Amino acid sequence: MSAPGRVWRNLPAKAKAKVGAVLFGLFLLAAVIGPQVMPYDPSYANPDPSLLMARPSAQHLLGTTQTGQDVLSQLLVGIRLTIELALLVGVIATAAAVLVGVTSAFLGGFWDEFLSLVSNVFLVIPALPLLILLLGYLPQRGQLPTIIVLSVLGWPWGARVVRAQTLMIRNRDFIAAARESGERGWRIIAFDIIPNEVSLIAASFVNTVLYAIGASVALAFVGLTDLNSWSLGTILYWAQGQQALQLGAWWWFVPPGVAVALIGTSLVLLNTGIDELGSPRLRATRGAARIAGRRVWPTDPTPVLAQLTASRGRLGGFLHSFSRGSLLDETTPAGGELR
Amino acid sequence: MSEPIVGGLPASGLPVTGEPAADASAAPAVNADAEQVGEPAAVTSAAAARGPLIMEAVALNKVFQLGRGASLQAVRNVSFGLYQGAVVALVGESGSGKSTVAKLLAGQERPTSGQVMLRGKPADVRRGRAFRRYKATVQYVFQDPFSSLNPVHTVGYQLSRPVKLHQAGVRDVRAAVTALLEQVRLTPAGQYLAKYPHELSGGQRQRVSFARALAAQPAVLLADEPVSMLDVSIRLEMLNLLDDLRARLSLALLYITHDIASARYFADEVLVMYGGQLVERGPAEEVTQRPAHPYTQLLIASAPDPDNLGSALKGGSASQSRASQSRASQSRAGNVGPAPAGCPFSSRCPLADDKCRRENPALQPLSPARAAACWRLDAAVPPPVASPR
Amino acid sequence: MSPVLDISGLSVAYRAPGGDVRAVKHVSLTLNAGEVVGLCGESGSGKSTLAYGATRLLRPPAVVTGGSVRYGGRRVTAGGDPVDLLTMSHRELHQMRWREISIVFQSAMNALNPVLRVQDQLLDAIRAHLPLSRGQAREKAATLLDLVGIPRGRLRSYPHELSGGMRQRVMIAMALAADPEVVIMDEPTTALDVVVQRDILAQIVELKETLGFAVLFITHDLSLLLELADRIAVMYAGRLLETGSAQAIMREPAHPYTRGLLNSFPSLSGPRRELAGIPGSPPDLRDPGPGCPFIPRCGHAVAACGELDMSLAPVTSGLPPGPVSHLTACPIVATQVSQEGVLS
């Protein structure tokens, strides 16, 4: 495995999740206060010719567009709009996915067949072309239609995953025991099954948000959303339309592009952390452990303390003996023998 | 000195056949056409001495459809009663249908034919309110303490639910839950309320399962292998607890197990199941001391008995190698044919003759309290039981 | 004759953020060629940790913190000194595995790969350790199934098509693939019915007589060991409490825990008597308390028990001394035994 690969594998889940959370938190902060603190109205086109497609300066920290609009302001509004849309789609689609997935697995029989059929059909439809078609035909182009369309196409994957998990849980004894106690069906679903799926639902939510960001940026880039609102994709649309790349106006398309990439990355990191936190088994088999200061892989034979410390040398052993939980203070045994 | 136990059957008196050929499938598929010949003998249950009849299984049959036209008769013509304050043990190997019987009695499955009677009236276990009312009288305890408790809820919450559902109008739920924990000897009860299942040992979890069943204040407790998954050293304590609960709460207890020794220790009446049928029934002491059916004899001979430890497992003897040869030849034949049309045990039984393979016997009476389903009862000489050292 | 496996003062711990869990504490055990040694203990007693730690199969965060595990099989030592598994490299251990020491794992249901046929799994084991061609390996797999009494036709079956007893036999066949000297059996019959269990045990004895390997049989069911084993070691909370021949343990249990265990089995042929079992539950290994770990559950405990160093001492008894020494960690019961003579 390559060095970066090894490093990635070994980072503990908590670190990944923390980095992801902090990064996403920053963007969330930007989304909330950004539009309040932005220096200019993003749509304001400054007619001053020296400020057309101008490089970043003290006045315009990220430069200006072809029509003299401030890129930084657009970026801040864009972050808010994009995150807003993505979170809304995440909530709606995940709620739908959980509802459909748990119900179909719990009820079984006809309902399971029917709901599975519905989710499979939606899964199979190629999403982007359908999105383009729908949005192309809808009279409005604003945020709302985009949210609706993305939610409608974004729930089936989560539904399938939740259904699979629910099928497994449904066969566990404690569900039958809840029935034995006389619990009603809906209470079993709400209080016995779903609490066991929290980390799955959280991961599914994050996944959906990620998908929504990607899809909305793609749609905006293609010009299918409201071009009067400044989402990140719209900025890129205009930048592309005005030949920003060819003209070398990197300050116009790099910031929104990087923002999209970073938001996506932060979500992926968050998700990895959730996966491993939710499944202790993943944690245990993850990678090497450190024992007595040395790295031990799961496929190595059980380490023997004497061997580990012997190869460290005296100074290392001396220093290590101060670490907490040191096993070096094992006293001579007085054990018996089976002869 | 006891008979050397060779290959699972006593070396004398019965031909040594050793390894049963029917080792291929865990559930001996019973031929659905193998109807029992004759009516099962009416027997006075040894448990009836303890108290009135509370629950009765009447000619229960359960056939599972396996898809592609195949079906599995898991339970055939099983009838018995549960009496207040008495323990009835249902003994059999995996695949014998004993768990299915319990599920039929619990209302988790519906019989294909036959009836479950509760206090003289047919049990009404349709969904909804009727089912919940049934649950207030008949409770089922699960086998696996590691999966019968919800891992995300505390013990206190999981016990409070059945209390609220069944003890309507109880003011202090916490006090009721504490009382339940004390009943199952989880004390001091207060410290268990906030614990999660993974913080408890197997034995403690199983006690919580008992407490949950008792919250409904049932009259009948169906315990499906309640101690099989616990360590040997705590099994006895749990059985003693069950016995104590039975006595104090006047429960009718159905104890399902594959361990016939614990059935002898604990039960009033023992019912032995094989291949979905009852093959023997009678008072616990008599069935275990003088087993009449060849399968019961096999069970008794195979069980490790601390008072009667045969030395046959250690040290090769001539009879040992003879047994192993015949065992090997038996198993080489494998078991890939359709189930026998007659007695389900006939493919493994050393006494089986043509009648056994053709006709499936119903329970034949042996005494007012005993019966066994076998055509060869006269020839099935029980192995001499050694006196303790 | 020197023992084929000599575990001496072995200690194994699991590193955990809250402090180390000492799962095995200074346990010594020997296995002579061709004998069956039973290791008895509840869940959490450390019996599996002992076996897997000795063969270095435990994954991190487990560490072997002390002791030695000397293997004296003739193929490896060539008549010389035994080799210590704890000092071997990964490569040397790989040579040892399966050819010298093999393991029949608990719960064959889970140990067999559900998506591979029996033949493929046997071939895996065979070709990993023996230099055979595919054809030779296939023939060997068939021979192994013959050995354990499974029809050859079953080679093409998947594990779920076999019964529990047959799956366990496949595991045994796999363990014998490279003709080892020592076979460690970890609760091989736990999930099986009594009838199948007895057949498997008889099969094991027969194979042992034929092929001549030694068996370390791990279980929580003492009654099995009393029938099957030559010598028995009783473990509790990571320590050995009592060791001796099966006869001695059965007739003169010299530790309150062993007595409690023997008193936990309802008898089939003896009189129907009231049994007490052992109250309480095993201690938390993170904080077992000083002295003997059995104190909270012991009816004979006195203040001095809290200061025991848990070394094993011979039992003075009314029985004539046999070739196998009978040792116990409980000084109180040892004296009782000598006073009371043979117990029933």
Please name every model-derived segment.
Chain A
Residues 1-94, 98, 102-103, 110-113, ...:
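Gly/Trp-centered helix-boundary motif
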Residues 4-8, 64, 72, 76, ...:
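Alpha-helical membrane-protein architecture signal
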Residues 22-25, 76, 88-95, 118, ...:
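Hydrophobic residues within alpha-helical transmembrane segments
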Residues 27, 102, 132, 136, ...:
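Transmembrane alpha-helix boundary and packing residues in multipass membrane permease domains
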Residues 61, 95-96, 105-172, 200-202:
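Generic hydrophobic transmembrane alpha-helix motif, especially the helices
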Residues 80-96, 186-218:
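Transmembrane alpha-helices
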Residues 123, 136-138, 166, 207-208, ...:
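Glycine-rich helix-loop "coupling/hinge" segments at transmembrane-helix boundaries
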